[in-house]
Regions:
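Solvent-exposed alpha-helix faces
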Residues: 33-37, 84, 155
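Hydrophobic-ligand binding "helix-grip"
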Residues: 54-55, 65, 69-120
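Short, solvent-exposed aromatic-acidic interface loops
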Residues: 93-97, 126-133
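Hydrophobic pocket/interface hotspot
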Residues: 28-32, 64, 79, 90, ...
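A conserved amphipathic terminal alpha-helix motif
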Residues: 129-161
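Short beta-edge strand/loop motif at the mouth of beta-sheet-based domains
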Residues: 35-76
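Tryptophan-centric aromatic hotspots in well-structured domains and transmembrane helices
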Residues: 39-40, 82, 92, 130, ...
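Hydrophobic ligand-binding cavity/cleft-lining segments
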Residues: 1-51
Length: 161
């Protein structure tokens, strides 16, 4: 298992991170999407209280959502591409305040590709259009691009595969 983040990209409005997992693309895609609740960092949520569950609706236009321990459900993104087992993309509506997104929230985009390699699957994640979050967007880039952001998420994903 390897992970890397392209540090040069941290100076732009996108973040890139990748990892290789010892599983075929079909399995990697399924764990990344349907199995998101098994690997998502539990402290990474936008609502008050504890994260109870996080999920993905498996179709274009579907929700990226979370439920807290009080039963409140929040949609924080929308599925933009659903192409098993090779590509998955969603909008990221969580802005610089890291709070519950409003109905008119501007969003960035996360695209995840799953490419077969000799040892399994290479998973490449690109979180781009970060500047669409407006003033303070650099804090979103700093958060998702830090070692505790997408790189940590991908390591946890790899452990769940």
């Amino acid at each position: 298992m390897t992970t890397q983040t392209d540090d040069a990209r941290l100076n732009s409005s996108e973040v890139r991170s990748s990892i290789e997992v010892a599983a075929p693309p079909e399995r990697a895609f399924e764990v990344f999407t349907a199995g998101i609740d098994r690997w998502w960092t539990r402290s990474h949520h936008v609502q008050t209280g504890e994260l109870k569950e996080i999920g993905v609706d498996p179709f274009v236009g579907g929700r990226m959502w979370e439920e807290n321990d009080a039963g409140d459900v929040c949609t924080w993104g929308r599925v933009l591409a659903w192409e098993p087992p090779s590509r998955f993309a969603f909008s990221w509506l969580i802005g610089p305040d890291w709070g519950v997104p409003g109905p008119d929230s501007a969003g960035s985009r996360v695209t995840v590709t799953f490419t077969p390699v000799a040892t399994g699957t290479r998973v490449d994640l690109v979180h781009d259009r970060l500047d669409a979050h407006g003033e303070g967007w650099e804090s979103v880039r700093a958060g998702v691009g830090s070692d505790g952001g997408w790189p940590a998420g991908l390591r946890q994903f790899a452990a769940a595969v």
